[in-house]
């Protein structure tokens, strides 16, 4: 699937159920691996990234059986992981590498973690510093992977994140489960996704959550999970964006996770005038879930400020496209974190959208988009640069443009959503 051609669509119509949430699936496999007994996971979001987590915890001594989107994890116990004698390969999964490092800080032995070329460019000093303060020995390669960690007797800390990052927060909180008496506290400059806190609480760990701060207390054991994973909001977002932009669209998405730390994209779309309704609200696996209905409408420009960024960081590429078809100029501020994702997403977004006719100007911490409320010209070839979010952005751009778009490196969607293109075609009306 190295190249995919996406033809313009008249509208999107249909009902969809997107795969289980990747972030929550990672956590279910990882925490199930150190729980007592057997954890059962249904509607798991199986992709290249989450399969890396399965392979990693197997290498460390847990047992995992996977069949379709169902999985059983037989945990090794809270301190039962063992160094396999060779590096643990995290593939492209930054969530896995950072969260696993927090868990390994509480294990006996010396562990080495490696990743692919993309993951090896992403910063790791941001987890090495707090874990070192807690008593673990963490060595990076000039601030990147490969990484080695040697667990030790951990002491609780109060740590203020220099940058809002759910992965760093989760790493520190997971290490806090292994610390000596007293809470480990993480203070955030802006709210980030709280899946780790919710799952730990459901497994019997004492957790305190309040605005801008999360704390965990040490535990002797983790209770096994029995969880149905909500649909991945970030996988739903491309369909939401396209349906918002294509006149005549009527789209329903069932069983989507609507955790408020993840749905900033909906908040921003509503501010722009979008018609997105959430109904049948419920709770699954300790997470809020709902069904979404989306219809097309005219949109107006808006500004996304730094405090909002963590709640839609994965959707900001899509926001750039939506903003390009709105009335007026839209701005994203305080999104420097985009530069250290699977690609430099600020530059990648510009390189995809500008040749298609979207007027976008980049800055160090974001971008400005000059909206024109009509279809961009499209056409040509764009490079997904090995980044699944950029491939999905290019696909949506192809749907809403006047001319077809060719996407090179389209196979990168397999990192999070292997069936993305098939699902997209199933609802496109031409």
Regions found by a protein language model. Give the residues of each.
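Structural preference for solvent-exposed beta-strand-turn elements
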Residues: 1-430
